[in-house]
């Protein structure tokens, strides 16, 4: 089980803050693509990704037990 | 001075010595909206000796719900935010020096201000200006605190040139199309949490306690009760164009700055922006629908916002009808698109 945490507008669009994916292994790109398709999250491409609370930039492999946080930067001030 | 700051001096991490350092310090606050007024008030009360504040807008009624320095009279008089802020801050603390600039934050206007500052507080409402601050901060080796908020969420990160990753290390391109306060709304607690962190970080830096700063990117949602600190220590890149060994400060380069032009006789400003091109159109339409009716065809989309009519072309151009003022047009686009 891979746990996905959605923040800001992404959580609102998806209608949930946490999603569990029943997979042993996946890459962060695969996860993004599947969320984009399933929930129509067009803006997911500009979001920051953190795996187990550590920032990842490149496409990264994650396994069951990992938590992937997807955080769109906000601009208001 | 003793009595006024006694409770802060009693806080042992600041003490007499720290208080003296604050009095000799200079903070630049870029933006006098919600984060700007909260940060400016806190740091003025704390006794930071010089505070410079720059903002391009004037006070409107919709600001009063969260932009804590402003009054109904400021909104009635449409006072420029920087001037209104200066007036209120001077009434709060007459012992400090406040400088106010009513102008747009550009490479030209910000560079001389950042050069004089010990710490910069980011209180802008758009990423174009943040990336400018990021480059100028690296160029002048000035620490700054990124902060942003929308709806019930916020985030912040302290950037110390030469030590921590910078905003360009995290975002290779300007993040575009994010929610803005005008599209997703905002509640004051989200503002105050971000600002409280920014002020704390500023106090640590100004009193020479870099070791105490928050190393990481913090994000929270005060309505949904989440808080996460993301480790970014490994993200600093040698090849980063803003802070790497061969930094070129990409956002200070002419090709990267949004081009605005007044269209003569049309009461219209045209803004051309590379990042506007990259926002997925469907996403933009969805977002703008929360403000008003969006009409779109294959080439452009069209929306009414306040007294303005905005047309956004697929090629990265936006026309803001209803103004001849570049500053105002940029401000409208910042509020509507976060550009």
From Swiss-Prot, chain A:
Pfam families: ThiS (PF02597). C-terminal thiocarboxylation occurs in 2 steps, it is first acyl-adenylated (-COAMP) by MoeB, then thiocarboxylated (-COSH) by IscS. The modification 1-thioglycine is found at residue 77. One of its GO terms (cellular component) is molybdopterin adenylyltransferase complex. Pathway: Cofactor biosynthesis; molybdopterin biosynthesis. The keyword Phosphoprotein applies. One of its GO terms (molecular function) is nucleotide binding. The keyword tRNA-binding does not apply. The modification Glycyl adenylate is found at residue 77. Keywords: Molybdenum cofactor biosynthesis, Nucleotide-binding, Phosphoprotein. GO terms for biological process: Mo-molybdopterin cofactor biosynthetic process. Belongs to the MoaD family. Involved in sulfur transfer in the conversion of molybdopterin precursor Z to molybdopterin. Heterotetramer of 2 MoaD subunits and 2 MoaE subunits. Forms a stable heterotetrameric complex of 2 MoaD and 2 MoeB during adenylation of MoaD by MoeB. During catalysis MoaD shuttles between the two heterotetrameric complexes. This is Molybdopterin synthase sulfur carrier subunit. The gene is moaD.
Swiss-Prot record, chain B:
GO terms for biological process: Mo-molybdopterin cofactor biosynthetic process. Pathway: Cofactor biosynthesis; molybdopterin biosynthesis. Zn(2+) binds at residues 166, 169, 240, 243. InterPro entries: ThiF/MoeB/HesA, ThiF_NAD_FAD-bd, Ubiquitin-activating_enz. The keyword Metal-binding applies. It is an enzyme of class 2 (transferase). One of its GO terms (cellular component) is cytosol. Belongs to the HesA/MoeB/ThiF family. This is Molybdopterin-synthase adenylyltransferase.
């Amino acid at each position: 089980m891979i746990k996905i945490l959605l923040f800001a507008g992404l959580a609102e669009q998806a209608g949930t803050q946490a999603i569990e994916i029943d997979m042993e292994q996946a890459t962060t790109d695969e996860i993004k693509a599947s969320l984009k398709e399933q929930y129509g999250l067009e803006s997911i491409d500009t979001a920051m990704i953190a795996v187990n609370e550590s920032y990842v930039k490149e496409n990264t492999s994650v396994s069951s037990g990992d938590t992937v946080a997807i955080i769109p930067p906000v601009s208001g001030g | 001075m003793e009595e006024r700051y006694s409770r802060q001096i009693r806080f042992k991490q600041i003490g007499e010595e720290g208080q003296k350092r604050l009095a000799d310090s200079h903070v630049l606050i870029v933006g006098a909206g919600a984060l700007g007024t909260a940060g400016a008030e806190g740091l003025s009360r704390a006794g930071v000796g010089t505070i410079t504040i720059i903002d391009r807008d004037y006070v409107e009624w919709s600001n009063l719900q969260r932009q804590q320095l402003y009054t109904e009279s400021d909104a009635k008089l449409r006072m420029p935010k920087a001037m209104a802020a200066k007036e209120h801050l001077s009434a709060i603390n007459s012992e400090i020096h406040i400088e106010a600039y009513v102008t747009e934050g550009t490479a030209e206007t910000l560079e001389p201000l950042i050069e004089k500052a010990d710490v910069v507080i980011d209180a802008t409402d758009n990423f174009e200006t943040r990336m400018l601050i990021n480059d100028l901060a690296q160029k002048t080796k000035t620490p700054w605190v990124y902060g942003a908020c929308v709806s019930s969420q916020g985030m912040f990160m302290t950037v110390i040139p030469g030590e921590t990753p910078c905003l360009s290390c995290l975002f290779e391109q300007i993040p575009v199309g994010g929610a803005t306060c005008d599209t997703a709304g905002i509640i004051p607690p989200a503002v105050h949490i971000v600002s409280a962190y920014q002020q704390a970080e500023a106090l640590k830096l100004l009193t020479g306690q870099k070791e105490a700063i928050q190393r990481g990117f913090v994000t929270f949602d005060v309505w949904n009760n989440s808080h996460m600190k993301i480790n970014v220590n490994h993200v600093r890149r040698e090849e980063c164009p803003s802070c790497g060994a061969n930094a070129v400060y990409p956002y200070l380069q002419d090709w990267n700055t949004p081009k605005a032009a007044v269209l003569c006789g049309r009461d219209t400003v045209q803004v051309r922006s590379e990042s506007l091109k990259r926002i997925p159109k469907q996403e933009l339409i969805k977002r703008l629908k929360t403000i008003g009716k969006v009409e779109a065809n294959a080439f452009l989309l069209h929306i009414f916002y306040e007294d303005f009519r905005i047309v956004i072309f697929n090629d990265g151009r936006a026309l803001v009808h209803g103004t001849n003022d570049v500053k105002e047009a940029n401000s409208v686009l910042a509020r509507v698109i976060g550009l």
